[in-house]
């Protein structure tokens, strides 16, 4: 997924409430939707149509045992120039994954990711937010690659370092990280996470009032698929507690 497509999905997820039993038709003013996508000025319908048309074509592949399911993120988009609103809805087949996994959801403020320009930064932020109260989390390298959708061997240079700079400047978190080695081989990345008052961060651009204060309901399922190609979910994340470590299993088996 592109960064813009990720932000559309995050906005829709932010509209889900933990007590919802069904998807709704989600809407917002077209002007706000245009700004949400990172544009300024008067909305250009051709640009928005191209973005949502491409998003509807994005296919998820979900493997559950012997079954392979294919579905779209979005099943319907409507631009109503008379009311000045855009309407979007999830594919109803996503209900078991986004509604019935409520207990795995972690909330964060939508405005904390809307200014991020890198898809990697968004995914790293979500990972950190999930573990922010642990403060110190170690993630095996192969699992981290799957979680962020990074196949490039230059993970530190192209993913971690840029994400660290952008997240620190624009969100409520900062983090340090270091490589964990076995011999000469890097086998894991250890993150040291710190929550920051938003006043410490650079000034965040104005975000429409309908989207700035709402929470995103983040789940491992969402992080698993918000990237260009669907990939397997990380099978476990180890969180360090003194000398021992607890393995936490999330997501669907591949």
Predicted regions and their residues:
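Charged, alpha-helix-forming regions
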Residues: 1-233, 245-251
């Amino acid at each position: 997924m592109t960064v813009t497509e990720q932000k559309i999905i995050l906005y829709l997820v932010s509209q889900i409430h933990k007590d919802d039993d069904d998807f709704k038709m989600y809407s917002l003013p077209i002007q706000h939707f245009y700004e949400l996508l990172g544009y300024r000025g008067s909305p250009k319908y051709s640009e928005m149509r191209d973005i949502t048309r491409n998003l509807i074509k994005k296919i998820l592949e979900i493997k559950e045992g012997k079954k392979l399911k294919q579905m779209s993120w979005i099943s319907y988009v409507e631009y109503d120039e008379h009311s000045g609103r855009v309407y979007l809805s999830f594919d109803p087949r996503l209900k078991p994954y986004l509604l019935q996994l409520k207990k795995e959801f972690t909330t964060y403020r939508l405005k904390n990711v809307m200014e991020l320009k890198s898809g990697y930064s968004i995914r790293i932020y979500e990972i950190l937010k999930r573990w922010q109260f642990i403060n110190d989390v170690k993630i095996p390298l192969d699992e981290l690659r799957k979680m962020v959708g990074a196949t490039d061997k230059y993970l530190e240079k192209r993913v971690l370092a840029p994400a660290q700079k952008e997240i620190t400047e624009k969100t409520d978190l900062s983090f340090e990280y270091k490589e964990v080695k076995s011999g000469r081989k890097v086998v894991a990345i250890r993150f040291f996470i710190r929550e920051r008052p938003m006043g410490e961060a650079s000034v965040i651009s104005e975000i429409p009032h309908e989207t700035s204060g709402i929470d995103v309901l983040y789940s491992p399922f969402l992080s698993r698929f918000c990237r260009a190609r669907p990939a397997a979910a990380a099978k476990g994340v180890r969180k360090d507690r003194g000398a021992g470590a607890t393995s936490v299993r999330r997501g669907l088996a591949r």
